[in-house]
């Protein structure tokens, strides 16, 4: 496993995930009967800061169909949590118009690179182009100066 699991922290994430799903209207319990499901949800809402009880609630009451999705969500959250500790692994987000994202994604796919690698490559290409243009301008100026002095 690449990232250390922190039971107390992840228990809070799981609790928040389940409460969010419940508020969005998803069935988070394994019970078909509405009163049993509501009783289980009420229990969940009272144990927010009790990692051991949250874990026990998940094993006893959670809808099994939700398990994989929750695991994936927690895994992604764990990765973001640990990556945020170091500046070089911290992720930033930017808003792109759909058409821009589509073109960037197509370019990245053609180059066989990630979106981040493609953006870095485009920036480097632009920097090289600026450097080249500056050099050419300087050479042109020097050449005109040489020709003008004769």
From Swiss-Prot:
GO BP terms, alphabetized: cell division; regulation of DNA-templated transcription
Keywords of this entry: Cell cycle, Cell division, Cytoplasm, DNA-binding
Protein name: Macrodomain Ter protein
Domain of life: Bacteria
InterPro entries for the chain: Arc_rbn_hlx_hlx, MatP, MatP_C, MatP_N, MatP_N_sf
Family under the similarity heading: Belongs to the MatP family.
One function term, GO molecular function aspect: sequence-specific DNA binding
Localization annotation: Cytoplasm
Assembly and interaction partners: Homodimer.
Any one GO CC term of the record: cytoplasm
Function recorded in the entry: Required for spatial organization of the terminus region of the chromosome (Ter macrodomain) during the cell cycle. Prevents early segregation of duplicated Ter macrodomains during cell division. Binds specifically to matS, which is a 13 bp signature motif repeated within the Ter macrodomain.
Naturally occurring in which organism (per UniProt): Klebsiella pneumoniae (strain 342)
Gene behind the chain: matP
């Amino acid at each position: 496993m690449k990232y250390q699991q922190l039971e107390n922290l992840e228990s809070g994430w799981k609790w928040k995930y389940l409460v969010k799903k419940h508020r969005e209207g998803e069935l988070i319990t394994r019970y078909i009967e509405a009163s049993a499901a509501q009783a289980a949800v009420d229990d969940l809402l009272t144990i927010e800061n009790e990692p051991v009880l949250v874990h026990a609630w998940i094993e006893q009451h959670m809808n099994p169909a939700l398990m994989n999705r929750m695991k994936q969500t927690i895994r992604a959250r764990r990765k973001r949590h640990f990556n945020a500790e170091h500046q070089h692994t911290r992720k930033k987000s930017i808003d792109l118009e759909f058409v821009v994202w589509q073109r960037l994604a197509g370019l990245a796919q053609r180059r066989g690179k990630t979106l981040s690698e493609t953006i870095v490559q485009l920036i480097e290409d632009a920097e090289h182009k600026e450097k080249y243009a500056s050099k050419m301008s300087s050479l042109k100026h020097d050449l005109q100066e040489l020709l003008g002095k004769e």
